[in-house]
Structures are given as C-alpha cells and as structure tokens.
Amino acid sequence: MNPFHQRHFLRLLDFSSAEIHALLKLAAELKSTKKSGTEKALLTGKNIVLIFEKDSTRTRCSFEVAAYDQGANITYLGPSGNQIGHKESIKDTARILGRMYDGIQYRGYAQTIVESLAKYAGVPVWNGLTDEFHPTQLLADLLTIQEHQPEKPLSEIKFAYLGDARNNMGNTMLEAAALTGMDVRLIAPEKYWPNAALVTECQKLAEKTGGKITLTENITEGVKNTDFLYTDVWVSMGEPKDVWQQRVHLLKPYQVNMDVVSMTGNPQVKFLHCLPAFHDEETALGKQLAAEFNMYGGLEVTNEVFESEHSIVFDQGENRLHTIKAVMVATLANDLKI
C-alpha cells in the first residue's frame, strides 16, 4: 500500500516523522537506480503542470528532469504564461487544471495560494516554494545530510543556520527539526527570527521527537560543535534599496566565513546553501551588492568557504532532483510499495 498516493506536498508538518524518513529512503533508492541505469518509469502517461510565478533554475530543472526520467509529460507556465489571480481566480484555475493534469507544482508567493490550488484541484499539488515554506528544499537538505553523515541518524545531527531566519527557509527548518529530532540552531538578530506561533508549534512537536530548537543572536554559542552550517541570500532582486541597507547592516556579522567555520570546533563541518549564492562578484547583482556594501569576496558566505572542502552545495543542489522525484512518484504512482 502507498500511503502517499494522491496526497499533496505543501509543508513538512503535513507528514509524520516516519513518512519524511520514507520519502528520504525512496529518494535515495531513485537516485541509486538513476546512477546505475536501472531506473523504472512509474509515471508513464502522467501529465504534470509546473506553475512558476517566480523564476527558478534548480526547482524547474528538477521537476522537468524528474518527470522525463519517470515517463511523465510536463507543461511549464512561467510568470507571464498564466492568468492565476489576474484574469482567473485560483479556485477556477485549480478546477480546470485538475481536469487536465495528474499533478500540479506551484512556485510563487503566499502559502494560501498553493493551499487553494490543493483544495480545489482534485489532484496532488506540490509546493515548489512559497513565501512561507520551501519543503522540497528541506527534503533535499535532509538527504544530503544523511549522505554526508551516514553513521549518524538525523536525530543526532547538530545544524546551525545563520542569517535571515524569518524567511521560508527558517520556517521550514523549524518543521524539519521538529519532525526528525535534529538539534537546529537559528542564529540571527532577534528581528529576523521566525514567527513566534510557528516556533511554539514546532517546539511542542520537537519535545515528542527529541528535537531541539534554539533561537539565538550569539554566533559563538550557536555554531559550537555543529555538523552543518547553512545560510541563504540576504537580499532579492526587486526589493527596495533601503531594505538592502538595513538588512545587510544587521546581518553582516552573521556572514559564514572561515572564522565561523573555526568556531564550530569541528574540522569536518560541512557547509550548505540552497542557492543561488552571492559568494563572489561574477553576477550583475553580486557585483552591485559588493560595491554597495564594500563586501568583496562574498555577502552571506565568503567565496573561501563556498569553494572549500567544507562546501557540499552542489551535492545538495543535485539532490533537489532526487527528492522532488520521490515526491512525484510517491503521490502519483498507484502501485508503489513504501
């Protein structure tokens, strides 16, 4: 029996700890069969629509390659290629797409949008990213952690995130900690801590799983003895410059650099980043930010750390493919045994 069949994937807390581990196991198996050339197509004849109100590289490519590998057909609707919320309501869009497609991916803005799609579509809906949550990213992160710490269960992992912790990554890390029993430290100015209600919800669940959730402004204490360091971009294209000024000023001390790596006391500590990263001046925005704030050689992470042996960001990026494939297969394959 497949307990995931026809279910949505909107946020991690929609699943139990055992179910998250089952998805990770399936992702590892699918990755292994792809690498060995023995992968079986379980989604032949399925039609999938990818709705992107925000552009993406990793998420789009992961869904497309995963679908192709599994024999499914895809339709891509980009930021200018759909009428959602403009000329057609979310409710109406969901009901028509649900008649045409077997699964719907949404990457965009409010969590309420993907939840509305799920409510009315009648087919599985997957959250590729919203302002509040990024569950496919955290699933890839957990698989990467398992691969690089195979001798430790997730419940024994110490994990530190530095920077803007009130965003979709910080929120989803709270959920991951609560479900897996990890020791997760969110290290940020208090202004950039996650919503208090979500913190409380996740802390209550963590008490049952053995997880530990810490919010702190203290970098030295926060990163001590951690197995993994993680950060995300501080600014996004399209945000007003006065927001940049305030945010970079407050977050500059939380940059992941070699001093922070040393503070962990763990010479084998690994570095994670959901990408893209402003670690050098080789992009237009990276160059602009470096000049604006006199932070050459990296913003949220230094190029030295990003390119070091500590960095596993490209293993992490690749695992988007395998974990997204696991979600698609688990929710669409009728006869899958998990």
Swiss-Prot record:
Where would you find this protein in the cell? Cytoplasm
Q: Where is it chiefly localized? A: cytoplasm
Report if keyword Ribonucleoprotein is assigned. no
**Ranges annotated as spanning the membrane:** none
User: For this protein, what is any one GO molecular function term?
Assistant: ornithine carbamoyltransferase activity
Q: Quote a single Gene Ontology cellular component term.
A: cytoplasm
Function text: Reversibly catalyzes the transfer of the carbamoyl group from carbamoyl phosphate (CP) to the N(epsilon) atom of ornithine (ORN) to produce L-citrulline.
Q: Which UniProt keywords are given for this protein, alphabetically ordered? A: Amino-acid biosynthesis, Arginine biosynthesis, Cytoplasm, Transferase
Please give the InterPro entries that the UniProt record associates with this protein.
Answer: Asp/Orn_carbamoyltranf_P-bd, Asp/Orn_carbamoylTrfase, Asp/Orn_carbamoylTrfase_sf, Asp_carbamoyltransf_Asp/Orn-bd, Orn/put_carbamltrans, OTCase_ArgI
According to its UniProt entry, the protein's GO biological process terms are: arginine biosynthetic process via ornithine; citrulline biosynthetic process; L-arginine biosynthetic process
Q: What is this protein called?
A: Ornithine carbamoyltransferase
PANTHER family attached to this UniProt entry: ORNITHINE CARBAMOYLTRANSFERASE SUBUNIT F-RELATED, ORNITHINE CARBAMOYLTRANSFERASE, MITOCHONDRIAL
Which pathway, metabolic or otherwise, does it act in? Answer: Amino-acid biosynthesis; L-arginine biosynthesis; L-arginine from L-ornithine and carbamoyl phosphate: step 1/3
User: Record's PROSITE patterns?
Assistant: CARBAMOYLTRANSFERASE (PS00097)
Which positions are annotated as binding L-ornithine? 168, 232, 236-237
Q: What is its EC number?
A: 2.1.3.3
Q: Quick one: which gene encodes this? A: argI
**Chain positions recorded as carbamoyl phosphate binding sites:** 56-59, 83, 107, 134-137, 274-275, 320
Per the record, the similarity remark reads: Belongs to the aspartate/ornithine carbamoyltransferase superfamily. OTCase family.
- Reaction(s) catalysed (UniProt annotation): carbamoyl phosphate + L-ornithine = L-citrulline + phosphate + H(+)
